[in-house]
From Swiss-Prot, chain B:
It holds the Pfam family Complex1_LYR. Belongs to the complex I LYR family. The gene is lyrm5a. It comes from Danio rerio. This is LYR motif-containing protein 5A. Signal peptide: none annotated. PANTHER family: ELECTRON TRANSFER FLAVOPROTEIN REGULATORY FACTOR 1, GROWTH HORMONE-INDUCIBLE SOLUBLE PROTEIN-RELATED.
Length: 254, 85
């Protein structure tokens, strides 16, 4: 097998950071906030690198769309073992409205350009939680898709994907080329250590513009309002069982 | 006279310092502890003992990586999966 795998990585606000909504409700505060690679993208990168280590594929290419800073995310992917990176430059207004459809178009165009035979993505990003990019990419390319993968194996010229579905697992076999999206249990991503980050600086990151790929990144979606989730109501302490039963009756629970 | 293990020790310190940036209790807390731990052994000269201490440091690196992974995994599981009954 001498295939090339394309892995999409997204730069998001770090999972451990408390998200704050902008006072004017147009979005969330991103300035001066720690960013890192989307956890599900880490799983996708790890899976691709593992396939390479097993010599089932030839090359792992990490792709990210966004402003200059996404190069850090690509660098993390390179430190984890990806061979080279592609930075699709999208900035300013276009980046603010960049959604799954636009990214899918970019990924689909790149997959054709790079002659990739497999695309591995995270199932969703922890910032917008769209869970659409993998599905749309597969649709645009007219490739089969294995979403929510918790196990991946090559079987002859096909790919066996075990999928996480409600209440259990589903095993499917799909033809290559294909799109796979990684679920949480697919693997344990390795840590991008300092020595590896340093070594990754020698790896190449190519710069591409969406226009070079013939992709229009304009969006037809408009964000009307971004709100904080409702805060949880405080509980009450009750002294006796009678009190408790009384309160429950009041609330109509018994 | 510079110790041949000097480079190794510096490498270990740098790697730990880098890992400390993600420490749940904060970078400053971690750096202080890290420095104290290294300074405590600054007078060790026996190469065998230094090697043992380096090995322990490498073990701590593995532990920290495992800690960060588990912390992230648990956060993701809590956010995206129904609690198991």
């Amino acid at each position: 097998m001498s295939a090339r795998v394309l892995v999409g990585v997204k730069r998001v606000i770090d999972y451990a950071v408390k998200i704050r909504v902008k006072p004017d409700h147009t979005g969330v505060v991103t300035d001066g906030v720690k960013h890192s690679m989307n956890p599900f993208c880490e799983i996708a990168v790890e899976e691709a690198v593992k396939l390479k280590e097993k010599k089932l594929i030839k090359e792992v290419v990490a792709v990210s769309c966004g402003p200059q800073q996404v190069q850090e995310t690509i660098r993390t992917a390179l430190a984890m073992g990806a061979d080279r990176g592609i930075h699709v430059e999208v900035s300013g207004k276009d980046y603010e409205t960049l959604g799954p459809l636009q990214v899918s178009k970019i990924l689909a165009a790149l997959a054709k350009k790079e002659e990739a035979s497999l695309i591995i993505l995270g199932k969703q990003a922890i910032d917008d939680d769209c869970n659409q990019t993998g599905q749309m990419t597969a649709a645009l390319l007219d490739w089969p898709q294995g979403t929510f993968a918790s196990e991946l194996a090559f079987e002859a010229d096909k790919l066996k994907v075990v999928r996480e579905i409600d209440g259990g697992l589903e095993t499917i076999k799909i033809k290559l080329p294909a799109v796979v999206t990684a679920d949480l249990r697919l693997n344990t991503p390795r840590y991008a250590t300092l020595p590896n980050i340093m070594k990754a600086k020698k790896k190449k990151i190519a710069m591409v513009k969406p226009a070079d790929l013939g992709v229009d990144v304009s969006s037809r979606l408009e964000v009307l309002k971004v709100d904080e989730p409702p805060t949880r109501q405080a509980g009450v302490k009750v002294e006796t069982v009678e009190d408790l039963v009384g309160k429950l009756k009041e609330a109509g629970r018994v | 006279m510079t110790n041949p293990l000097r480079g190794e020790v510096i490498r270990l310190y740098k790697n730990l310092l880098y890992l400390g940036r993600e420490y749940p209790k904060g970078t400053a807390y971690f750096r202080e502890r890290l420095k104290t731990a290294f300074m405590k052994n600054k007078d060790v000269t026996d190469p065998e003992k230094i090697q043992k201490l380096i090995d322990r440091g490498d073990f701590v690196i593995k532990e920290l990586e495992a800690l960060y992974y588990l912390r992230k995994y648990r956060a993701m599981k809590k956010r995206y999966y129904e609690p198991e009954h």
